[in-house]
Amino acid sequence: MTIIIAGPTAGGKTDLALNLAKLIGGEVVSVDSRQVYKYLTVGTAKPEGEYKNGVYNVDGVNYHLVDFLDLDKTYNTGSFTADASNTAYNINKKGKTAIFAGGTGMYMQSYFGGMDVLPKADQALRAQLADIADKEGKQSLHKMLSEADPESAALIPSGNLHRVMRALEIFKLTGKKASELRTNGFADISQNNFMVYIEWDKEELNKRIEIRTQGMFGGMLKETQDMLAKGYTRNSPGLRSLGYAEVIDFIEGKKTKPEALERIVILTRQYAKRQRTWFARYKNMYKADGSALNAEQILAEYAAWKK
């Protein structure tokens, strides 16, 4: 018994998941690579909750796989798949529906459809790539990726050095494109699961992103200041979450507040575009109008799908 809710950032996935869970007595499983981190609530749009009997609870709904990882720890697709498997098993064992909600498409695909096994990190190769980036600039690595794997390069921002290096690493270690390894043999998870995609007009979503960013900046600033005071740095995996580097730049005087806000808005819009591209691969989703979400209607569609 599973429902999947997908869509771009700032699209309303969390609210819909909570409303559905309340209607059917279900529990939510977050599919978000950033909300796993403790302390970062505002900047990751993590729903505010409290722990009850060891489980994060939001307005009476158990909300799993959020707020448990230290900022110095890394989390990946394999970690999520293992954690999600255990979580869903325990939810279903209670006779409840697991509502998977989030925008980290790779996590979603890995759990529901499986993915090719990717090679482990090669530290020597990474050191070589890092040296190239230091001497020739980040753009040089992105250019290398564009030549080796244009599909991955189109999805990865040139400034995201970690992801650019990982895609190049995969290509150099396997001789295959990361984009091919991540798509060949991909099951269309919307064919065998009830999958809701929250759809938005591009301009409407862009406006929502801008408004949300402006509203969360003060909270992100306080969170970031608190984490820096605890000894974390911009290189801590958790603080590499979208937007926090710009807040740190503001704290350090490298950006004005308007500059930091503008940059976060741009990065978030780019992220939303990549999410739309990812989820477009699924051909049998129920598309729900983000401006008029109706949990009861979606449950009716779910009931019809199960027949």
UniProtKB/Swiss-Prot annotation:
Statement: the UniProt record of this protein carries the keyword Nucleotide-binding: yes
UniProt KW Nuclease keyword: no
Domain of life: Bacteria
GO biological processes: tRNA modification
Positions that bind substrate: 9-14
Gene3D superfamilies registered for this protein in UniProt: 1.10.20.140, P-loop containing nucleotide triphosphate hydrolases
Protein name, UniProt field: tRNA dimethylallyltransferase
